Amino acid sequence: MSQIKLIVGLANPGAKYEGTRHNAGEWLVNELARMYNTSLKDEAKYFGKTAKINTVNGDVWLLIPTTFMNLSGKAVGALAHFFRIKAEEILIAHDELDLPPGVAKLKQGGGHGGHNGLKDIISALGNNNNFYRIRLGIGHPGHKDQVAGYVLSKPAPQDQQKINAVIDEASRCLEILFKDGVTSATNRLNSFKA
């Protein structure tokens, strides 16, 4: 596998969206930054907040786009093109309706599953979907007509606890990924349930 050089946490910007389910990817990147004693700074030329962490495998960029979710590719594309980071060296953390809270899955490739952030990133990378993703379960409201309101609202306290637990586990699994590779990290994360 290629070494991961960029980890992106998808979110919508602004106080209005803080703490909403759609921002789960951002929570993971913030936790990773905290583990490495750094904080993300606004970087206008990458349309997001960035930081660089030093792992056992070398430097890894952290990015939280400050565009709206459906324009996430603008930020990912800008940073990836500038540093010549290939799609398979990118990991995207995002909310996942098809997994329950407290569950996360690490995988490479695949479609966008209706996720507008992923859709825009695939497009910005020249229709290349070969990046890794950590799908953070947020559960499903039950009917597709309720999805927009659901992802833009805050989780119930018991769901938030489960999401926090899986984010904690996912951040540990990223350390395993840096040290032992994607297979070890995938096996551990994909069998976890809060």
From Swiss-Prot:
Return the EC number: 3.1.1.29
InterPro entries from the entry? Pept_tRNA_hydro (IPR001328), Pept_tRNA_hydro_CS (IPR018171), Pept_tRNA_hydro_sf (IPR036416)
Query: Could you tell me the keywords of this UniProt record?
Result: Cytoplasm, Hydrolase, RNA-binding, tRNA-binding
- Offer one example of a GO biological process linked to this entry: rescue of stalled ribosome
* Catalytic site positions: 22 (proton acceptor)
The chemistry this enzyme catalyses reads: an N-acyl-L-alpha-aminoacyl-tRNA + H2O = an N-acyl-L-amino acid + a tRNA + H(+)
**SS bonds (residue pairs):** none
Assembly and binders:
Monomer.
State what protein this is by name: Peptidyl-tRNA hydrolase
- Recorded source organism is Haemophilus ducreyi (strain 35000HP / ATCC 700724)
Gene name of the encoded protein: pth
